[in-house]
Amino acid sequence: MSLQKKISQELHVQPSIDPKQEIEKRVGFLKDYLKKTGAKGFVLGISGGQDSTLAGRLAQLAASELRQEGKEDAVFIAVRLPHGVQQDEGDAQLALSFIQPDKSWKYDIAPAVTAFSEQYQKDTGGPLSDFNKGNVKARMRMIAQYAVGGEEGLLVIGTDHAAEAVTGFFTKYGDGGADVLPLTGLTKRQGRTLLEALQAPERLYLKKPTADLLDDKPQQTDETELGITYNEIDDYLEGKPVSEQAVEAIEKRYVQSEHKRQVPASMFDDWWK
């Protein structure tokens, strides 16, 4: 078996999907898992990008259906987590209008990130690099979501999907920290087809994806940082032909980021050997 096929199988990617069936399955999964855990509902940070828009809408559909089925306390809370002023705030508001969450809260992570960065420099004698400060931002968002989840009895939703998983393009214990992952197995383009089926505004899934974590490179696109396109990543995952350069880049990132897809290593594990 080729490494390409092995990776696709491990990440549960299907070469083609039926968007409406996928929506139904993923909403059903959220409902079933919520019932199993005994939690009241879900919480998710909404950025205005494709992934949080899709995961947020699926969560709201799940909460709404659960209430109709008799779980009266089922709720979805969307949380805006800007770092100061977000340049694409309009997209975030458009996403909220589409998702129609039961509740929408806002928590500005900038004061907490600034306080941490200043204390770090004071106690270590050196500043955080822009890259590591970006990871602090992602982890601060995780902290905020888990604070809401803990206080309200909610599960934290993660937005990880196959195109991010294969490249390790997420912050460990940041946006990678979650209780439940409704987008697992989807490529980036497959996620777009689900949003199309849900009649989301085109602007939310046609915009260039950006993690927007770096102060020095605001709104830098994911593809610029990765050095490969999502079309190349999706083609690879869906078993289609891709250039040797893209294959090498994707597989190198997959191997290097294996630790992100595993629980912390112990001497009893063999995945790291």
UniProtKB/Swiss-Prot annotation:
Keyword line: ATP-binding, Ligase, Magnesium, Metal-binding, NAD, Nucleotide-binding
This enzyme's EC code(s): 6.3.1.5
GO CC terms, sorted: cytoplasm
A matching Pfam family: NAD_synthase
Protein's UniProt keywords contain Nucleotide-binding: yes
Residues reported in the UniProt entry to bind Mg(2+): D51, E164
Residues annotated for deamido-NAD(+) binding in this entry: R139, K172, D179, H259, K260
Domain of life: Bacteria
InterPro entries linked to this entry: NAD/GMP_synthase, NAD_synthase, NH(3)-dep_NAD(+)_synth, Rossmann-like_a/b/a_fold
Residue stretches spanning the membrane: none
Annotated ATP binding sites: G45, I46, S47, G48, G49, Q50, D51, S52, T159, K188, T210
GO BP annotation list: NAD biosynthetic process
Class of enzymatic activity (EC top level): ligase
The reaction(s) this protein catalyses: deamido-NAD(+) + NH4(+) + ATP = AMP + diphosphate + NAD(+) + H(+)
Pathway entry: Cofactor biosynthesis; NAD(+) biosynthesis; NAD(+) from deamido-NAD(+) (ammonia route): step 1/1
GO MF annotations in UniProt: ATP binding; glutaminase activity; metal ion binding; NAD+ synthase (glutamine-hydrolyzing) activity; NAD+ synthase activity
Task of the protein: Catalyzes the ATP-dependent amidation of deamido-NAD to form NAD. Uses ammonia as a nitrogen source.
PANTHER family, alphabetized: NH 3 /GLUTAMINE-DEPENDENT NAD + SYNTHETASE, NH(3)-DEPENDENT NAD(+) SYNTHETASE
Family: Belongs to the NAD synthetase family.
Oligomer and partners: Homodimer.
Protein name: NH(3)-dependent NAD(+) synthetase
Species assigned in the record: Bacillus pumilus (strain SAFR-032)
